[in-house]
């Protein structure tokens, strides 16, 4: 895992002596802002303590609607469990989140689950922890440890990937300037989402957010090109 703070500090010190490195500093900071980590597929983990069984499920999600659908599914599947607690985090900025104790003492279930999501810097993820009571009370600290450990097991079993935040741009241009446009596309390597060729050509490209300003700046120099 990259230590962006460390990179930032080194680049800043270097830029104090070399003004030309300011672009590198800006690029490194932008790179850290348009990436995020999530999981590829569902994974599970199990933790037991004093005969209580904690079953954790980590699921990739994109919306609150998906979260609700998964919760309904697992609440039905584990209808006989004492508690079905959860936490989720959504969006590349990691601002949309929630933790739920589902009847456990306040802060003993949802919060430690969310803590594991945060410690792994994940988003677009839902972690559900199902508890089957074993007849022996664990106490507040015991519950916190158990829910944290179960969530950690599920996340550890998952495949974590880093994704980029992408942006799309659509523009029109006249056919005689096709070579100029394609030269930019070849060198900047955006993904072509849509293209149509006539006397007035239309194209939609997608590229990493931090690289969009450069792409647009180069396209703006192509004669007759105009953005939609």
Q: Which positions does each model-derived feature cover?
A:
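C-terminal regulatory domains involved in ligand/effector binding and gene-expression control
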Residues: 31-107, 194, 221
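Short glycine-/aliphatic-rich beta-strand segments at the starts of folded cytosolic domains
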Residues: 160-175
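Short amphipathic alpha-helices in soluble, non-transmembrane regions
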Residues: 184-186, 215-223
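Conserved short beta-strand edge segments in small beta-sheet-based binding/regulatory domains
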Residues: 192-197, 221-228
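Terminal, non-globular segments
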Residues: 205, 211-214
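Short amphipathic alpha-helix segments
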Residues: 173-189
């Amino acid at each position: 895992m990259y230590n962006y703070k460390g990179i930032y500090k080194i680049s800043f010190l270097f830029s104090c002596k070399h003004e030309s490195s300011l672009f590198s500093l800006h690029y490194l900071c932008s790179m850290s802002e348009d990436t995020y980590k999530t999981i590829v597929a569902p994974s599970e983990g199990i933790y037991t303590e004093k005969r209580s069984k904690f079953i954790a499920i980590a699921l990739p999600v994109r919306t609150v609607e998906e979260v609700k659908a998964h919760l309904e599914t697992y609440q039905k599947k584990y209808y006989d469990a004492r508690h079905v607690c959860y936490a989720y985090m959504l969006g590349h900025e990691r601002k949309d989140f929630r933790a739920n104790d589902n009847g456990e003492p306040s802060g003993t279930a949802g919060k430690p689950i969310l803590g594991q999501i945060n410690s792994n810097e994940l988003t677009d993820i839902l972690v559900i922890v199902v508890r089957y009571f074993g007849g022996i009370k664990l106490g507040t600290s015991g519950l916190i440890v158990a829910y944290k450990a179960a969530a950690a097991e599920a996340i550890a079993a998952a495949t974590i990937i880093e994704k980029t935040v992408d942006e799309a741009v659509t523009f029109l241009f006249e056919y005689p300037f096709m070579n100029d446009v394609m030269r930019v596309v070849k060198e900047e390597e955006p993904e072509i989402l849509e293209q149509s060729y006539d006397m007035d050509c239309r194209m939609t490209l997608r590229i990493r957010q931090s690289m969009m300003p450069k792409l647009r700046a180069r396209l703006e120099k192509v004669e007759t090109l105009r953005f939609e």
